Amino acid sequence: MIVVVDCKDSFVYNLVEYISLFDKVRVVEKESAGLLRKMSFDGVVISPGPGKPDRSLEFVFKMGVPVLGVCLGHQMIAEVFGGKVGRVEPVHGKTSLVEHDGRGIFKGVRNPLRAGRYHSLAVLEPPEGFEVCAKSEDGVVMGLRRGKIHGVQFHPESVLTEDGVRMIRNFVEMCHDG
């Protein structure tokens, strides 16, 4: 089972639908995320949402399961691990070409990838120990990875993103590969 932490974005249930193609999924609101401490699951997706990243979900990264952060979730990863998140030129409902390394969630995904973006904040400095695994054509960090922790600034669940279902399937497979 994959848990989606709902950070109140309108795309949350697109993520849920994609995940449900490959595994059971449960949605837990961010305000109730403490419930995860008592649950059994194979992976966590931290959803997009409005506002600024914070450290409220820091405990999730210590649970030993794969984590995928999307947009705000990606920014939370950077925030929790000491990276820097800040304002960038707003990009809402636009596509960009994203170059990636073809590993992890990007395995088997076309390169460059056309990805849907909806953000005005981004990772300006990645956390130490994380690799930048994807960047947009305008130089914005679009993917971070360290071990079982993965983040993407763009929205794989958007219809604007090519191979979004493939990326989610790759993540679910990682959750079951140990």
Curated annotation (Swiss-Prot):
It is an enzyme of class 4 (lyase). It catalyses: chorismate + L-glutamine = anthranilate + pyruvate + L-glutamate + H(+). GO terms for biological process: L-tryptophan biosynthetic process. Gene3D superfamilies: 3.40.50.880. It comes from the Archaea. PROSITE patterns: GATASE_TYPE_1 (PS51273). Pathway: Amino-acid biosynthesis; L-tryptophan biosynthesis; L-tryptophan from chorismate: step 1/5. One of its GO terms (molecular function) is anthranilate synthase activity. The active site is at 71 (nucleophile), 155 (for gatase activity), 157 (for gatase activity). Residues 1-178 form the Glutamine amidotransferase type-1 domain. L-glutamine binds at residues 49-51, 75, 120-121. InterPro entries: Anth_synth/Amidotransfase, Class_I_gatase-like, GATASE, TrpG/PapA_dom. GO terms for cellular component: cytosol. The keyword Amino-acid biosynthesis applies. PANTHER family: MULTIFUNCTIONAL TRYPTOPHAN BIOSYNTHESIS PROTEIN, MULTIFUNCTIONAL TRYPTOPHAN BIOSYNTHESIS PROTEIN-RELATED. Part of a heterotetrameric complex that catalyzes the two-step biosynthesis of anthranilate, an intermediate in the biosynthesis of L-tryptophan. In the first step, the glutamine-binding beta subunit (TrpG) of anthranilate synthase (AS) provides the glutamine amidotransferase activity which generates ammonia as a substrate that, along with chorismate, is used in the second step, catalyzed by the large alpha subunit of AS (TrpE) to produce anthranilate. In the absence of TrpG, TrpE can synthesize anthranilate directly from chorismate and high concentrations of ammonia. This is Anthranilate synthase component 2. The lineage of its organism: Archaea, Methanobacteriati, Methanobacteriota, Archaeoglobi, Archaeoglobales. The gene is trpG.
